[in-house]
């Protein structure tokens, strides 16, 4: 897997593009005007592993709230702007580290220029965002429907507007809820510009469908070397977006750190509540700072062999289970002590 070499862009304290680590993003779902609630959510995201946060800025009050929010958080903040160019200007003046706009809905060129001039003054990058759902009518007609080619043309038109105003601190985001259309659009745009790409499958759905669509789409793009920041968009608790993004990156070898839990799918030999045990293990290890693989297996017959690729694991039996390291049985443990035995082993693990 070779990553595309894109332009380096500074977003607050973080650099993206140019081979820098792929950053995980999410978006608050609080009212940005509610500073306390928004800060609390951002801090929770930060703890979960979010590295860049985006906030909706639909009002002047929200734009002005960014100044206080910025004082209390530790990760770069992106202001999401639609329609009113004055909100973009106010967001920059109040400390936004990046703004997300679609120049096509901000107004005429003079208004776009006012935003670009303010971004230049504060050295704030602009994310140019285009979604398939808001594709211009003329492009839909030109390509006979919503297509990857139309999405890319729309995005490049918006990029060109800002470039002609003398600014190139840009990030490009092109999204669709159609996985393969989204993949094709990113393949096309990567050939036509070298700005960092923020990738994701928009409106991907609930926890189940959203994770599947995002994993497939992001997995294909990341494997091709596309993407400098990612978001897994889910209808649900945004913290789950961050967990999923981390695991997608880790699964592709693009990120290390954090315990990976593997478990068997259960069968007729399973003698314990493996589903409950695996969930407890996953919750237990979330805050343990190790970069290892932990196996949770359902029987003592095949468990040791199946867990040999894990660094450590447990396998359940009738009333007792096994502690396993690298496929070797270390000791037998009472069933009710399996979880605590594993926890102690992890807490005493040599880093």
Residue ranges, per PLM feature:
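Hydrophobic faces of well-ordered beta-strands that scaffold small-molecule active sites
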Residues: 22-28, 53-55, 77-81, 99-101, ...
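Glycine-rich, proline-tolerant flexible connector loops at the mouths of alpha/beta enzymes
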Residues: 29, 46-69, 100-108, 170-179
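Glycine-rich phosphate-binding active-site loops on the catalytic face of alpha/beta enzymes
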Residues: 51, 95-109, 201, 224-238, ...
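Hydrophobic or amphipathic alpha-helical targeting/insertion segments
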Residues: 86-127
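Active-site mouth loops of central-metabolism enzymes
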Residues: 19-37, 56, 75-83, 139-152, ...
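Catalytic alpha/beta core domains of metabolic enzymes, predominantly
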Residues: 131, 139-286
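N-terminal amphipathic alpha-helix/helix-capping segment at the start of soluble metabolic enzymes
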Residues: 1-27, 120, 283
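Alpha-helix-loop-beta-strand connector modules within alpha/beta enzyme cores
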Residues: 60-81, 114-126, 186-197, 281-283
């Amino acid at each position: 897997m070779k990553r595309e070499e894109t332009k380096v862009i500074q977003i607050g304290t973080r650099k993206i593009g140019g081979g820098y680590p792929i950053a995980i993003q999410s978006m608050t779902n609080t009212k940005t005007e509610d500073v306390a609630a928004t800060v609390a959510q951002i801090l929770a995201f930060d703890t979960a592993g979010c590295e860049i946060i985006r906030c909706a800025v639909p009002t002047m009050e929200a734009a002005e709230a960014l100044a206080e929010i910025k004082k209390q958080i530790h990760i770069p903040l992106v202001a999401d702007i639609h329609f009113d160019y004055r909100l973009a200007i106010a967001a920059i003046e109040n400390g936004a580290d990046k703004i997300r706009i679609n120049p096509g809905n901000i107004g005429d060129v003079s208004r776009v220029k006012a935003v670009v001039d303010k971004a230049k003054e504060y050295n704030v990058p602009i994310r140019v965002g285009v979604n398939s759902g808001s594709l211009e009518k003329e492009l839909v007609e030109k390509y006979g429907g919503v297509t990857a080619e139309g999405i890319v043309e729309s995005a490049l038109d918006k990029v060109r507007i800002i470039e002609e105003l003398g600014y190139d601190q840009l990030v490009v985001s092109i999204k669709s809820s159609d996985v393969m259309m989204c993949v094709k659009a990113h393949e096309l745009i990567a050939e036509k510009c070298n700005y960092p790409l923020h990738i994701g499958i928009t409106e991907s759905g609930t926890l189940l469908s959203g994770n599947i669509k995002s994993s497939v789409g992001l997995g294909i793009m990341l494997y091709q070397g596309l993407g400098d920041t990612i978001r897994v968009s889910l209808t649900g608790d945004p913290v789950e977006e961050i967990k999923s993004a981390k695991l997608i990156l880790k699964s592709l070898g693009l990120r290390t750190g954090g315990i990976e839990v593997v478990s068997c799918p259960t069968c007729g030999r399973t003698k314990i509540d493996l589903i409950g045990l695996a969930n407890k293990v996953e919750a237990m290890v979330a805050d343990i700072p190790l970069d290892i693989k932990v196996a949770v297996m359902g029987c003592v017959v095949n468990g040791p062999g199946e867990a040999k690729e894990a660094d450590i694991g447990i396998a359940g039996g009738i009333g007792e289970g096994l502690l396993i390291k690298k496929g070797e049985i270390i000791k037998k443990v009472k069933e009710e002590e399996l979880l605590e035995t594993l926890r102690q082993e992890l807490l005493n693990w040599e880093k």
